[in-house]
């Protein structure tokens, strides 16, 4: 039984764990990508590894791209100022 656990753990480490989240995709200076429609956001999000994306109308940061299942290595909008 211990061998099965160890083999499972080793396979998990070899494969790696990919974490995703739903969030506003951000530019390097912590600014959101503003939008007018869903097509541009969906392309931006999927090009960055997300499952999909859409334009969040009237959200916290105005009309901005929201991504579904965005990988952890892609920057997201975090609290604080946009440094343009």
UniProtKB/Swiss-Prot annotation:
One of its GO terms (molecular function) is sodium channel inhibitor activity. InterPro entries: LCN-type_CS_alpha_beta_dom, Scorpion_toxin-like, Scorpion_toxin-like_sf, Scorpion_toxinL, Scorpion_toxinL/defensin. This is Toxin BmKaTx13. Belongs to the long (4 C-C) scorpion toxin superfamily. Sodium channel inhibitor family. Alpha subfamily. Residues 84 form a propeptide. It comes from Olivierus martensii (Manchurian scorpion). Keywords: Disulfide bond, Ion channel impairing toxin, Neurotoxin, Secreted, Signal, Toxin, Voltage-gated sodium channel impairing toxin. Residues 1-19 form the signal peptide. Expressed by the venom gland. Alpha toxins bind voltage-independently at site-3 of sodium channels (Nav) and inhibit the inactivation of the activated channels, thereby blocking neuronal transmission. This toxin is active against mammals. Disulfide bonds join 31-82, 35-55, 41-65, 45-67. Residues 21-83 form the LCN-type CS-alpha/beta domain. Has the structural arrangement of an alpha-helix connected to antiparallel beta-sheets by disulfide bonds (CS-alpha/beta). The lineage of its organism: Eukaryota, Metazoa, Ecdysozoa, Arthropoda, Chelicerata. GO terms for cellular component: extracellular region. It is found in: Secreted. CDD domains: neurotoxins_LC_scorpion (cd23106). GO terms for biological process: defense response. It holds the Pfam family Toxin_3.
């Amino acid at each position: 039984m211990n061998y099965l656990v160890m083999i499972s753990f080793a396979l998990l480490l070899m494969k790696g764990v990919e974490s995703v989240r739903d969030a506003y995709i951000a530019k390097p200076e912590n600014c959101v990508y503003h939008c007018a429609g869903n097509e541009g956001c969906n392309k931006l999000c999927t090009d960055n590894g997300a499952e999909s994306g859409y334009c969040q109308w009237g959200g916290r940061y105005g009309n901005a791209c929201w991504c579904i299942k965005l990988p952890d290595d892609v920057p997201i909008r975090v609290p604080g100022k946009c440094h343009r």
